[in-house]
A protein has these predicted regions:
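Extracellular/periplasmic envelope-modification machinery, especially enzymes
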Residues: 1-191
């Protein structure tokens, strides 16, 4: 994907609605659109979706997504959303992975840029729970054990501790820079 990949339908609104929410991130962020679209249908907000597969939503000069992310900054400047939601499959971009990595300094730089552009509310969505192994295979293995009764509401065995570490790191960043933080990890794991 390049900087011209975003369809106009994602960023051009025809309503006079001054309240705009901009969703920025990768394909994991795109999952949030359906829920946000509810508010758009109700006429409360215009929702602008700028998501690109495997592109961390941070300003970083050293990634293949740099041109695309610069375009996001330009679109924020021109559309003036009141809220920007930043979300992604953060565990892919953790510094230990082989993907374009995201580090704390680049995330802070990105948030600072949004503030300079006049965004009044920035929401950082943290990582979702993940497991060391394939979750469906773990459930099949568990179902074959003598302890099996019913599928568990929550499965903590085999849970990736890296998710907890990353969630704590991102929550600390959000607190440090004064933005809202939503933790799917804490919500889904009843923490």
């Amino acid at each position: 994907q390049d900087a011209n990949s975003f369809s106009d339908v994602c960023v051009i609104t025809e309503s006079a609605q001054p309240k705009k929410i901009l969703l920025w991130g990768d394909s994991h962020a795109a999952q949030l659109y359906a829920g946000l679209h509810y508010y758009e249908r109700e006429g409360q907000y215009d929702v602008l979706q700028l998501t690109a597969s495997a592109c961390p939503p941070v300003i970083n000069e050293n990634t293949r997504c740099n041109g695309l992310n610069k375009k996001v900054i330009q679109l924020i400047a021109s559309t003036r959303p009141i809220t920007v939601i930043i979300s992604g499959h953060w565990s892919l971009y953790d510094e230990s992975k082989g993907w374009d990595h995201m580090d704390a300094a680049n995330l802070v730089k990105t948030i600072d840029e949004f503030k300079k552009l006049g965004v009044t509310e920035i929401i950082l969505f943290g990582p979702v729970p993940s497991w060391e192994s394939n979750l469906p295979k773990m459930l099949v293995k568990l179902s074959k054990s003598s302890d099996w009764k019913d599928p568990p509401d929550r499965l903590t065995s085999g849970f990736s501790q890296n998710t907890k570490i990353l969630d704590n790191k991102m929550e600390a960043i959000a607190k440090e820079v004064g933005i809202s933080y939503i933790s799917p990890y804490q919500t889904f794991c009843n923490l």
